[in-house]
Amino acid sequence: MKADIHPAYETIEVTCSCGNKFETRSNLCKPLGTDVCNECHPFYTGKQKTLDTGGRVQRFADRFGAFGKKPAATPAE
């Protein structure tokens, strides 16, 4: 590597919106704020929400399932 062409690589403090703080190294050289971290992200905390895609599909089928079908033939007199 060439000398004196690379940015400074220093330890910075990262602060999450939940209040968790940790240190990492970066060339940003100033404190960093983030929205989620491993302490508050739903994937890591186990508080994931599952989407009800089956209910949405069923609701669509209820509304538009008969669309395009021919009406039942009535018996001729």
UniProtKB/Swiss-Prot annotation:
Q: What does this protein do?
A: Binds the 23S rRNA.
Q: Which gene is transcribed and translated to give this protein?
A: rpmE
In this chain, Zn(2+) is annotated as bound at 16, 18, 37, 40
Q: Which NCBIfam families match?
A: L31, PRK00019.1
Question: What is an example of a GO molecular function annotated in this UniProt entry?
Answer: rRNA binding
Q: Matching PANTHER family, A to Z?
A: 50S RIBOSOMAL PROTEIN L31, CHLOROPLASTIC, LARGE RIBOSOMAL SUBUNIT PROTEIN BL31A
Q: What is the lineage of its organism?
A: Bacteria, Pseudomonadati, Pseudomonadota, Gammaproteobacteria, Pseudomonadales
Sorted alphabetically, which keywords does the UniProt record give?
Answer: Metal-binding, Ribonucleoprotein, Ribosomal protein, RNA-binding, rRNA-binding, Zinc
Which domain of life does this protein belong to? Bacteria
Q: Which GO terms describe its biological process?
A: translation
- The protein here is known as Large ribosomal subunit protein bL31
Q: Where are the transmembrane segments?
A: none
Question: What is the free-text note on the cofactor?
Answer: Binds 1 zinc ion per subunit.
**Could you give the subunit structure recorded for this chain?**
Part of the 50S ribosomal subunit.
